[in-house]
Amino acid sequence: MRVPSTGRGALPRPRLLTRGMAVLLATALGACARSTPHGAATSSASPPPEERVLRVYNWDDYIGFHTVADFERATGIQVVYDLFDSNETLEGKLLVGDSGYDIVSTSENYYGRQIRAGLYEPLNKAELPNWKYLDPQVLAVQARFDPGNRFAAPYLHSMNGFAYNRSLVRARLPDAPVDSLDMLFKPEIVAKFADCGVSFLDSPDDVIQLALAYLHLDPNSRRVEDLAAAEQLLLAVRPYIRVFDSSDYINQLATKELCVAMAWSSDYSIAVVRSRAAGLHLDLAFTVPKEGSDITYNALLIPIGAPHPHAAHQFINFILDPNVIAAITNDIHYGNDNLAAQPLVDPQIRDDPSVYPPPQIRARLYLPTEFDAKYQRLRTRTWTRIKSGI
């Protein structure tokens, strides 16, 4: 087993598609349209036996503490476990082809277009008896991006919002609107926390979507004028933002280097765990803002041409075991959507609204969407101006 670690917090799920990636993706779509369709007949000759190896490509801090070792022990399959730090890195490997990986993890607005580009193998449900434990409602959501749930196996979910240190915030603004995106986007409020540190995610899609939600506009809007309004909002608070960061902010919250941070919900949970491990008892909290936020469902998929497809199915079925996925949730505080696993999740985690949002929070969550390459380039240029404060 080889499981490298950066030692950082759970890395982001950026959604930005660069211009070069867009061109490659368009080329891949065309090429795949001319190649063998999914599910087409293949040679009747029996394939050679697979070597007992599995290559996994995943985010940092996105697996249970003992999951890989337990899988190796249960199956005798050796796991090579590599890490990536952005969806762009993963997508680049998939588009080039012959990645050598058997399992990858990404979110719905990425795998939707990647499925259409023919970058994944269809799942053989006969090899996934634990599929029966999955929440039908979540499968229905994912079917919007993966019709028929043919390619993507639900893994974990998280939300966007902001984390903050209660004591540091109260000391500066006793009546701070901690239920609202005013904490991030209202200049006179954000300025109050500039001295103790405010950070935004280094993810244009997440930041711009939250800005649009704050303006009571469609978070997935493709209107140029809506993007311009979000840009002006963000430029107004730019002087008070210490850093744009999607990984180190977890540690900085735990060590009081930041007092307010745009965050993914489960990263906040990791920050709490790390602060306790360091002997720090921080008064941290997380808010899914009343104006709305996104929820992201990550999945496990098998890249086209994976060298060990049977081992990949064994791994997915292992992850879908209620005991296994519950242990993952208990370790890293990401919610899972396995119905049979819920009674096995630590009650403190199961009752945490930042991990399992109750109906009143779910009502204000939205799914991210896909953008065409032209609009994505416009967002990229806008993001560059925002970060530079121009």
Regions found by a protein language model. Give the residues of each.
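Short, low-complexity disordered leader/linker segments with a strong preference
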Residues: 1-53
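Early extracytoplasmic/lumenal segment of secretory-pathway proteins
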Residues: 32-35, 40-114
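Extracytoplasmic ligand-binding site segments that recognize negatively charged/polar headgroups
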Residues: 105-240, 245-254, 271
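A ligand-binding cleft/hinge motif common to bilobed small-molecule-binding domains
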Residues: 110-113, 260-281
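Short beta-strand->loop
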Residues: 121-132, 182, 278-294, 303-305
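Periplasmic-binding protein-like
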Residues: 227-236, 242, 280-301, 350
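Conserved C-terminal helix/tail region of periplasmic/extracytoplasmic solute-binding proteins
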Residues: 251, 359-390
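Mature extracytoplasmic/periplasmic domains
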Residues: 298, 303-364
